[in-house]
Each structure stands twice: as structure tokens, then as C-alpha cells.
Amino acid sequence: SHFEGSTEEKETATVVDHDFMSYTQGMKFFDPHMHMSSRTTDDYQALADAGVVALIEPAFWLGQPRTGLASFKDYFSSLVGWERFRSSQFGIKHYCTIGLNSREANNEALAEQVMEILPLFLQKEGVVGVGEIGFDDQTAAEEKYYRAQLEMAKEMNLPVQVHTPHRDKKKGTE
């Protein structure tokens, strides 16, 4: 367990977990926003044990800038291929959204290249929308590529999964 605390707190947590598992036993769950690329197969097993039968994994910023188009292709390919396979081993249906994350929109030369390949990936099996797109630093480039991806979603008749900024959220959502 990731729960840290006194022995009494741990015992209480176990009781709560047991009660919760009894209460939800037999129920099925769908998680609409989960980043599985960074998780282990133990996490898939825990999800299956908890009754999760399907999830959507949005494309996102991996914590460091991608510096070339090949890294985007590899990442998008893993979402539509490898992660679907991994989740299927646990009886979980894996869907995803594909998009240029706001943090990576500020490298405009690379962003233009990514925009060219997005339609190819948006047509793949298991892709259910454009995302996760939106704002982070709230720059003109982020606005440009957000609007371009909204237009792409409209043309392809796909829903959009929106990312709101971590900082200055009010400004970024007005």
C-alpha cells in the first residue's frame, strides 16, 4: 500500500479498503483519464481487480521535451498498439486520445510536423478523440495549435479532451 502512517491508521485504512471492495464488488468501472504508459503491469492487475473494464489514455507531455518527430511517432504508436495489447492481457479495453500537448506547442517547427501526422493517428482503431490539448504557459503558440486541433477534431467529427493549465488556471480557462 502507498498509505503511510501509524499502525492504527494503517489498520483503519485496511478496514476502509475492505468495506469499499465489498461495496463495489461486481461493479464495472470506466476511467476516462488515466496515463498508463508510465505504469507497471501490477497497476493493470490492480485496476482489473477493482472492476475497471475500460479506460481512456490521453496523449500527454512525458515530463521532458520531445525533440524530433520520430519521438512523437513512437509515442503515438505505443498508445494505439502496445498499451492496447498490455491492457487486453488484464481484460481492460484501452482507448486513447491523440494530440499535440500544449507544453510541446511552443516548439513551432516541431509542432507543425506533428500537426501533419495527427490525422494518421486519429484514424487508428481505439482512438476516441483529440487530446489532451489546451493551455499550459498560455502562449500565442499554444492558442494557435489549440485552435488548429479543435478545427481538426471538428473536421474528423471527434470529441476533444481538454487540458487546463496547472498554473494560473483561471486565466487559462476564461
Regions found by a protein language model. Name each.
Residues 1-174:
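Mid-domain alpha/beta scaffold segments of enzyme catalytic cores
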